[in-house]
Amino acid sequence: MSSSENFVIALDGGSGTGKSTTAKLVAKTLGITYLDTGAMYRAVTLAALDKGLAAEEGPAMDELLKNLDLGFDSENHILINGVSRESEIRGMKVSSNVSIYCALPSVRAAMTEKQREIGKKQSCILDGRDIGTVVFPDAKYKFFMVTDVKVRAERRYKELLEKGEKVTLEEVLNNLVERDRLDSSRTNAPLKKADDAIEIDTTHISIQQQVQKILDYVGVVA
């Protein structure tokens, strides 16, 4: 891998597969930018819920997207119109609605444009559902992460409990199953593995092993 050329690493997969944690560590190891695209979609969802907007196309949603200022602070936490809402976007309220809002063509178009703007300026790793198929179909490196849904549910359940959320394991599991269904079946930019992506099953491996697999393919020794 040349250190002088800009490149994109596309990391796709379903909810709870460890994409974000893995992407952050890969970015840190390589010294490149990490773009949390999932946080961007969660931020749009939270902003829409704040305003009581239904998940449908129309002038109200267009106006929201037009005036929505998304950014990240020094710790890579999402900023919505300059205000950190990191803890709120990770809650079950947003998790239960994000797949519905992010399926809207206007939302995906707006977020895809923002993601491409960032990715064209610097080397970066992006994690999401359609990075390797839609956002950066010509990305130099593409990976697709899969994990048994019960394992994903247990991981997410533990995370939510640590954050003080009152939720049951069954609720988390049902939420993941439904999100998988919505993400994979939507017409616009569905969750699917790019033909040229490397699949990584994270069910029985640690985060560090996930990171190392990507670094091995990229050609870097951690």
Short names for language-model regions:
Residues 22:
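Hydrophobic positions on the alpha1 helix immediately C-terminal to the Walker A/P-loop
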Residues 19:
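Conserved lysine of the Walker
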Residues 64, 115-122, 129, 133-134, ...:
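Small-molecule kinase domains that catalyze NTP-dependent phosphoryl transfer to phosphate-bearing small molecules
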Residues 14:
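P-loop (Walker A) phosphate-binding loop of NTP-binding proteins
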Residues 38, 82, 111, 125, ...:
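Residue-level signal for inorganic ion chemistry
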Residues 28-91:
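N-terminal phosphate/diphosphate-binding loop that engages ATP/GTP or pyrophosphate donors
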Residues 9-11:
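Hydrophobic anchor at the beta1->P-loop junction of P-loop NTPases
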Residues 86-163:
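ATP-dependent NMP and nucleoside kinases share a basic, alpha-helical "lid"
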